């Protein structure tokens, strides 16, 4: 990446970017929601597309001069449709949260009941948390995992649905290492007259590669981020396997009289002008590039390696006496419950940071500690896999983590972290990130 102009004109920002580049280059990124985009994606995101306002949709813009950004957005939409096997897609949401907000506001009224996975059991803020719009505008009810197995009990989900009669049921998670049975959720939704939304922000890349269940045949709406396992720029997206008439009875007047609006029309209007104005066309261009990359055969091999690395790490952790919520992983992440290691999530995160390993503290189901302390850490493999690391490296990384956590309460913990950091740096330099040119 050529940053000579930035270095000369704004050395302070340049220095921040240079230091972040060094951090990414020399340390291990194990946060499950993070990844490294390709140089092509970054070039698109840093292109002249950032200069263009394009309120509206391709062919129906409020501004002139949109003929080329229309090309980029249509490429993104067409590639996403091919990637996920869907009939409708909106690539304009700025984030996964705004994608979720658009769907909820499109199909619900304030006070309507919704159901989603409890945040402390692995869910997401936008699935009904009381500190989020989803729990403030709507009557949110949270289902959870079984205390013994750490897995969602569909019988309890159905019991809750029959009791609260939600208008919308949300599947998906930010810290759940098992899959979702979309068919079973749809059966529950149909029994209570609810719509069903799948938030696949975390496993989207695995879904695209055919290595995780595709929700399109069963869910009315599918939302996702475009980074994480999909390895694109930070952003959001809304999809539907099949378009359908909106169930709210919303109509539109045409030359031939009024008709019921299609759900795609309702969602498009909710994204813009409902909650957003101008889309970020440089990011949409980056999304198009990332979707094109994900359509290549190499991406499926990458996604498989993500799963292989995660499975190897989980097995190694279990062999070392760690407790993994739900007993293992079927995707790209795992949630370690550290209570049997006499260390909390905050301490573990900080010590691992000193050792050059980035993870995030995370609540575990039925946690007795606050979200600022937590009893666990979340670990994911997308970023390390992008570097080219495989099972052997995954197992070595578990050894690094175990050395640090095992020494957490020892007087020499600082020395252990320093020694591990040197080994982590050596490992990372053996799997370089080639996207950043000569910035450092």
Curated annotation (Swiss-Prot):
Homodimer. Belongs to the SHMT family. The keyword Nucleus does not apply. Catalyzes the reversible interconversion of serine and glycine with tetrahydrofolate (THF) serving as the one-carbon carrier. This reaction serves as the major source of one-carbon groups required for the biosynthesis of purines, thymidylate, methionine, and other important biomolecules. Also exhibits THF-independent aldolase activity toward beta-hydroxyamino acids, producing glycine and aldehydes, via a retro-aldol mechanism. It is an enzyme of class 2 (transferase). It is found in: Cytoplasm. One of its GO terms (cellular component) is cytosol. Keywords: Amino-acid biosynthesis, Cytoplasm, One-carbon metabolism, Pyridoxal phosphate, Transferase. The lineage of its organism: Bacteria, Pseudomonadati, Chlorobiota, Chlorobiia, Chlorobiales. The record marks 227 as: Plays an important role in substrate specificity. CDD domains: SHMT. GO terms for molecular function: glycine hydroxymethyltransferase activity; pyridoxal phosphate binding. This is Serine hydroxymethyltransferase. The keyword Cell membrane does not apply. It catalyses: (6R)-5,10-methylene-5,6,7,8-tetrahydrofolate + glycine + H2O = (6S)-5,6,7,8-tetrahydrofolate + L-serine. InterPro entries: PyrdxlP-dep_Trfase, PyrdxlP-dep_Trfase_major, PyrdxlP-dep_Trfase_small, Ser_HO-MeTrfase, Ser_HO-MeTrfase-like, Ser_HO-MeTrfase_PLP_BS, SHMT-like_dom. GO terms for biological process: glycine biosynthetic process from serine; tetrahydrofolate interconversion. The gene is glyA. Its EC number is 2.1.2.1. Pathway: One-carbon metabolism; tetrahydrofolate interconversion; Amino-acid biosynthesis; glycine biosynthesis; glycine from L-serine: step 1/1. The modification N6-(pyridoxal phosphate)lysine is found at residue 228. (6S)-5,6,7,8-tetrahydrofolate binds at residues 119, 123-125, 370-372. Its cofactor is pyridoxal 5'-phosphate.
């Amino acid at each position: 990446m050529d940053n000579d102009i930035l270095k000369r004109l704004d050395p302070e920002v340049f220095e921040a970017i240079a230091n972040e580049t060094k951090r990414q280059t020399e340390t291990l990124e194990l946060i499950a929601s993070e990844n490294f985009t390709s140089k092509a994606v970054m070039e698109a995101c840093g292109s002249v597309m950032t200069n263009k306002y394009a309120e509206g949709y391709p062919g129906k813009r409020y501004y002139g001069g949109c003929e080329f950004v229309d090309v980029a957005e249509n490429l993104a939409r067409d590639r996403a449709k091919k990637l996920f096997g869907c009939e409708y897609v909106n690539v304009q949401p700025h984030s996964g949260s705004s994608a979720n907000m658009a769907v909820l506001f499109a199909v619900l009224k304030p006070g309507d009941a919704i159901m989603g996975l409890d945040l402390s059991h692995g869910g997401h803020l936008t699935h009904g948390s009381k500190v989020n719009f989803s729990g403030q505008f709507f009557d949110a009810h949270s289902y959870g995992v079984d205390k013994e197995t750490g897995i969602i009990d569909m019988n309890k989900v159905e019991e809750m649905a029959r009791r609260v009669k939600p208008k919308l049921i949300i599947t998906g998670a930010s810290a759940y290492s098992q899959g979702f049975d979309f068919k079973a959720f749809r059966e529950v939704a149909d029994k209570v007259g609810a719509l069903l939304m799948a938030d696949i922000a975390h496993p989207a890349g695995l879904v695209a590669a055919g290595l995780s269940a595709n929700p399109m045949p069963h869910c009315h709406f599918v939302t996702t981020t475009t980074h994480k396992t999909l390895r694109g720029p930070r952003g959001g997206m809304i999809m539907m396997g099949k378009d359908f008439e909106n169930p709210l009875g919303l109509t539109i007047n045409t030359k031939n009289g009024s008709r019921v609006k299609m759900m795609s029309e309702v969602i498009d209007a909710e994204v813009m002008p409902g909650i957003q104005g101008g889309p970020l066309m440089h990011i949409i261009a980056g999304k198009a590039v990332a979707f094109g990359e994900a359509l290549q055969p190499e991406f499926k091999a990458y996604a498989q390696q993500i799963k292989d690395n995660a499975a190897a790490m989980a097995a190694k952790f279990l062999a070392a006496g760690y407790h993994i919520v739900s007993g293992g992983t079927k995707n790209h992440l795992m949630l370690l419950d550290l209570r049997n290691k006499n260390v909390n999530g905050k301490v573990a995160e900080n010590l691992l940071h000193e050792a050059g390993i980035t993870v995030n503290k995370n609540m575990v189901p039925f946690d007795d500690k606050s979200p600022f302390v937590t009893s666990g850490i979340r670990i994911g493999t997308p970023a390390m896999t992008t570097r080219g690391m495989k099972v052997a490296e995954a197992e070595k990384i578990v050894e690094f983590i175990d050395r640090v956590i095992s020494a957490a309460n020892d007087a020499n913990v600082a020395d252990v972290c320093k020694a591990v950091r040197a080994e982590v740096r050596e490992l990372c330099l053996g799997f370089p990130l080639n996207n950043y040119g000569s910035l450092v």
